[in-house]
Amino acid sequence: MTTLNAKPDFSLFLQALSWEIDDQAGIEVRNDLLREVGRGMAGRFQPPLCNTIHQLQIELNALLAMINWGYVKLDLLAEEQAMRIVHEDLPQVGSAGEPAGTWLAPVLEGLYGRWITSQPGAFGDYVVTRDIDAEDLNSVPAQTVILYMRTRSAAT
């Protein structure tokens, strides 16, 4: 019996799974499912309590590095009473997702939503969403996802 020391590669499986989920469940159900997966991931490993956005950004980047999921930049938008979350180097599942290559973006919505609302000073009913129309997607790299965290009433 031959034993290989290589780690398994799940990219082909994930790409086929993404197509099946999209075809059978539809985009809205897929996004809801992936948001819940993100919340579940965030519950498995959480950042320590941080007193500043800068500290939180450092801690979130340390967690993302553990799973090779890119990195994040957090910006408070005082006038909009929102937080801009720019995630770079999101793993791709082939070209799946809208825009292409961003199939896992809803996972980030759940992940950041749970991570950030667990911090001191986070109060209210927050939601993390992608706002594709708010950014010029041609001006950012393909593996960059821009999210906004707002109170639920301001997001709808």
Curated annotation (Swiss-Prot):
Record flagged with keyword Transferase: no
Pathways per UniProt: Glycan metabolism; bacterial cellulose biosynthesis
UniProt entry tagged with the keyword Ribosomal protein: no
Signal peptide start-end: none
Annotated keywords: Cellulose biosynthesis
GO BP annotations listed: cellulose biosynthetic process
Classification via InterPro entries: BcsD_bac, Cellsynth_D_sf
Function of the protein: May have a major role in the perfection of crystallization, involved either in the pore structure itself or in the organization of the pores within the linear array of terminal synthesizing complexes (TCs).
Protein name as annotated: Cellulose synthase operon protein D
Species for this entry: Komagataeibacter sucrofermentans (strain ATCC 700178 / DSM 15973 / CECT 7291 / JCM 9730 / LMG 18788 / BPR 2001)
Underlying gene: bcsD
